[in-house]
UniProtKB/Swiss-Prot annotation:
<dbReference type="GO" id="GO:0044874">
    <property type="term" value="P:lipoprotein localization to outer membrane"/>
</dbReference>
<keyword id="KW-0813">Transport</keyword>
<dbReference type="InterPro" id="IPR029046">
    <property type="entry name" value="LolA/LolB/LppX"/>
</dbReference>
<comment type="similarity">
    <text>Belongs to the LolA family.</text>
</comment>
<keyword id="KW-0574">Periplasm</keyword>
<keyword id="KW-0143">Chaperone</keyword>
<comment type="subunit">
    <text>Monomer.</text>
</comment>
<keyword id="KW-0732">Signal</keyword>
<dbReference type="GO" id="GO:0030288">
    <property type="term" value="C:outer membrane-bounded periplasmic space"/>
</dbReference>
<dbReference type="Pfam" id="PF03548">
    <property type="entry name" value="LolA"/>
</dbReference>
<dbReference type="InterPro" id="IPR018323">
    <property type="entry name" value="OM_lipoprot_carrier_LolA_Pbac"/>
</dbReference>
<feature type="signal peptide">
    <location>
        <begin position="1"/>
        <end position="21"/>
    </location>
</feature>
<protein>
    <recommendedName>
        <fullName>Outer-membrane lipoprotein carrier protein</fullName>
    </recommendedName>
</protein>
<keyword id="KW-0653">Protein transport</keyword>
<dbReference type="InterPro" id="IPR004564">
    <property type="entry name" value="OM_lipoprot_carrier_LolA-like"/>
</dbReference>
<comment type="function">
    <text>Participates in the translocation of lipoproteins from the inner membrane to the outer membrane. Only forms a complex with a lipoprotein if the residue after the N-terminal Cys is not an aspartate (The Asp acts as a targeting signal to indicate that the lipoprotein should stay in the inner membrane).</text>
</comment>
<dbReference type="GO" id="GO:0042953">
    <property type="term" value="P:lipoprotein transport"/>
</dbReference>
Length: 206
């Protein structure tokens, strides 16, 4: 996708737009009915001028509440696993694992946000925004000022399927996620949400 198209799409996504009435309903349906979820994703990180900093891709899955697995395949291999109590960040290239309590990580990764159950209305101020093409957008602004992201937008299909996420951090960097090969409520085995550090890696705990 060209830089011009990034600018057009993301500038529209991050501007205030008229209020509509169906995105919050889509979110509530997604939270209440999508108890498990898996998809592939493409991720693009852009600076405040919409210059591409980095692209990545991989797969993700979650099981509510608080269990998720987020795997980066390209351009580097990284794994994030939430087991319901802790979140494990494994960087294969660095041979390092960082461990956080789940409640500390809920605002720091898209995976933790999506797997967080029905607390999103408690933790975020929600605003419905306009339909853009086939996507209905919802804006979520964290109530906790220590959240890693200042603004999050969720894009749903008209049938209530999560298709995209746009996240802006305190440095005005934007992370754009597009999901594909989506399955809602697949059967996921418990071992997917368990992690044992490989031998020889450094383990850093909060």
């Amino acid at each position: 996708m060209t830089r011009l198209l990034f600018v057009l799409v993301l500038s529209v996504c991050l501007l205030p737009v008229p209020v509509k009435a169906s995105a919050v309903k889509s979110l509530k349906t997604f939270v209440n009915k999508a108890l498990t979820f898996q998809a592939n994703f493409s991720q693009t990180l852009l600076d405040k001028n919409f210059q591409v900093i980095r692209k990545a891709s991989g797969s993700m899955m979650f099981e509510r509440p608080g269990k998720f697995r987020w795997t980066y395949d390209q351009p580097y291999q990284q794994l994030i696993v939430g087991d319901g109590k802790q979140v494990w960040f494994y960087d294969q290239d660095l041979a390092q694992v960082t461990v956080h309590r789940l409640d500390q990580a809920l605002g720091s990764t898209p995976a933790a946000l999506l797997a967080g159950g029905n607390t999103i209305e408690r933790d975020f101020n929600l605003q419905e925004i306009d339909v853009q093409g086939e996507t209905e957008w919802l804006e979520a602004i964290p109530k906790n000022q220590e959240n890693s992201f200042e603004l999050i937008r969720l894009g749903f299909s008209k049938t209530g399927i999560l298709r995209e996420m746009v996240l802006r951090d305190s440095f005005d960097q934007v992370t754009w996620l597009i999901f594909s090969e989506i399955e809602q409520n697949p059967t996921l085995t418990p071992d997917l949400f368990q992690f044992t550090p490989p031998e020889g890696v450094d383990v850093i705990r909060d």
